[in-house]
Amino acid sequence: ALYPTFFDTVRLNEPLWTFCRQFRAGSGRVWVVSTGSRANIDNVMRHLGIGGPTAEGGVSETGFHSGVTDPAAPLGRVDGILSGADVERPKPAPDCFLEAMRREGCTPRETLIFEDSAIGIEAARRSGASYFVVKL
């Protein structure tokens, strides 16, 4: 019963998502890292029209489709998703960001994090990566 009310308040940060799409077009990689459940992350991304990672450009195990032209993901897709269940210690511990970096094969020096919550900002700071504070 909470989802319809919650989804009414969820809005895409257009400037941030434009940056992410341009970054991906230039060979950058974009991940969603959240302490939320994978089901909640998937539901929010579907609501916003953002697709998740796929194998060979098909449908991922979560049902997301790849590609900007796919009607199921009209705004494009991300390269990876990490949920709270993927790490032992949630934010403000840096584990979620460090695990995403490990999976992507990059270092904190090669990583840029965008965060909107106090605990997320603390986790980003503790990860050693550069970060921006996003106001929603």
Task: Locate each region found by the language model.
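Metal-dependent phosphoesterase signature
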Residues: 1-28
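Conserved phosphate-coordination/catalytic loops
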Residues: 10-14, 91, 115
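Alpha-helix C-terminal capping segments
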Residues: 23, 104, 131-134
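Residue-level detector of anion-binding/catalytic polar loops
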Residues: 29, 130
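Substrate-recognition "cap/lid" segment bordering the active-site pocket of phosphatases
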Residues: 31, 37-112, 118-126
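Short glycine/proline-centered loop/turn elements that form peptide/ligand docking sites
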Residues: 117-120, 131-136
